[in-house]
Amino acid sequence: MSERLMAGRLNEKNIGEKVLLKGWVQKRRDLGGLIFIDLRDKSGLIQVVFNPDHSKKALETAENIRSEYVIEINGTVVARDEATINPSMKTGKIEVNASSVQILNKAKTPPFTIQDETDVSEDVRLKYRYLDLRRNSLQETFRLRHQTTQSIRNYLNDKDFLEMETPILTKSTPEGARDYLVPSRVHPGEFYALPQSPQLFKQLIMMGGFERYYQIARCFRDEDLRADRQPEFTQIDIETSFLTSDEIMDMTEHMMKKVMKEVKDIDISLPLPRMPYQEAMDRYGSDKPDTRFDLELIHVSDIVASSGFKVFSQAVDNGGKVALLNIKGKADNYSRKDIDKLTEYVKVYDAKGLAWLKADESELKGPIAKFLSEEEVAGIRDRANVEQGDLLLFVADKTNVVYDSLGALRLYLGKELGLIDESKFHFLWVTDWPLLEYDEGLGRYFAAHHPFTSAIEEDLDKLETDPASVRANAYDLVLNGFELGGGSIRIHQKEQQDQMFKVLGFSEEEARSQFGFLLDALEYGAPPHGGIALGLDRIIMLLAGRSNLRDTILFPKTASASDLMTAAPSGVSDDQLQELSIQLQSGEKNQ
């Protein structure tokens, strides 16, 4: 029996060989007496010729073959005539003369053509995901995903890490996003939660003495979705004992250097740049800045603190900021109507408006110019390095609104003006995060990362007296404006964990109820430990040049957390609900 060969791997060295091929019919062309088929398998395409001079029977069978039929071909590899060479195909210099063909399975006419360029809606593609996955671009994406995970595994295995599995059915905790809950049949009225991350288990693994753990972990979060979020996702989960934050960052960036070289053949320089959180916010208005282009925020609060333009001076008086973007040389590119569109854009981020000025040779012109003194104009010109033709866009508001709106506007303009080199990969560590965030509505602090993150040692004494100023021993890895993931050195002493829970507003009873197992473990010689978790789906999205996370997940959910292919979520039977001691409220759906 002949060994099957892969269609896309045939080349001129195979000319004259008899081959066995199996795959799908990409395209069929009947030229009257001759039939041509593009045969597709996971390796690519090859043209197969059915010619009565080689086999009448094969030609007769081919007359009944249609797109996406699964077929088996026996034939001979031959060189194409010079005039029929197809430079757009990897196998375009050869073809296979069929001596026999067998139809292994027929196919209905697909709801869309199986090719990379398709204008079919994403909903249709997701409903027929098994057909969508046949497209070459998705095949390439999932090969890249496999290569990436293999590269990561090989690196960590060589560094003496153990790949270990943590529970999927676990305990619901109050911090973070909403949990997906799983009702217990054995314990009526009680619920498991699907893990948002293996955070506590990997810390317990360190307390178990393994020292180096990793997992390609499935995680679940019941949160509002967007282009770079999914309810179930995969993260590269890593935890170590006895390493400092610098050592963990060094190890992680060497791992990413290996991935970039092996998967993309790109060399990245180490060490990766680092930037404190506050600097990232001040310069880019973002804690995950895209550093592939400049266009940084320019702060002018001190210059306009006493301005006659009350929007500016009142923002400063109220403890806010005034900052601007200088769009170099683009004043003539933006009409009032265009600027109005930009104003509507920043309002999405709670900005009240967008003030603007245009620079000519001698002055700044615009609706707010008459309210600014000569000293203020001179100060703005100097601070923003204003030149003829520049467009200045200001936001004056609460500090977080200024950062959010100008940070988002910066990215919008970067894309609109073609300032971003899409071929570049810019990594960045963001460090010195705030340990806590204050929620004015609830009147309490929340952990900026999670409640198990340790403070930088020199800030520990301020945890109860000035919690807002305490910095976390935490670090996020950013690539091209996307957070790949983050990590921290964990709290390993019970007294500090108790103190952290107290600052977060937990009573002793609440802390014991939710995290008693962790507090107990901390009393039995927990080692200093820390780690990191990187989003695998997001890494693949960026390496594959995808704009949508769904294209990196085999069977993703829609923006409404639905699976259009299987129709999940779905109702269940009354018997199933009764077994789980669950009764639906009136008006809720079931089967």
UniProtKB/Swiss-Prot annotation:
Keywords (A to Z) from UniProt: Aminoacyl-tRNA synthetase, ATP-binding, Cytoplasm, Ligase, Nucleotide-binding, Protein biosynthesis
Amino acids binding ATP: 221-223, 230, 483, 535-538
Keyword Transcription regulation belongs to the record: no
EC number: 6.1.1.12
Pfam families, per database record: GAD, tRNA-synt_2, tRNA_anti-codon
Protein's GO biological process: aspartyl-tRNA aminoacylation
Annotated stretches, region: Aspartate: 199-202
Superkingdom of the organism of origin: Bacteria
SUPFAM superfamilies in the record: Class II aaRS and biotin synthetases (SSF55681), GAD domain-like (SSF55261), Nucleic acid-binding proteins (SSF50249)
Single GO MF descriptor: catalytic activity, acting on a protein
Binding positions for L-aspartate per the UniProt entry: 175, 221, 449, 490
Subunit details: Homodimer.
Function: Catalyzes the attachment of L-aspartate to tRNA(Asp) in a two-step reaction: L-aspartate is first activated by ATP to form Asp-AMP and then transferred to the acceptor end of tRNA(Asp).
Name this protein carries in UniProt: Aspartate--tRNA ligase
Protein's organism: Oceanobacillus iheyensis (strain DSM 14371 / CIP 107618 / JCM 11309 / KCTC 3954 / HTE831)
Phylogenetic lineage: Bacteria, Bacillati, Bacillota, Bacilli, Bacillales
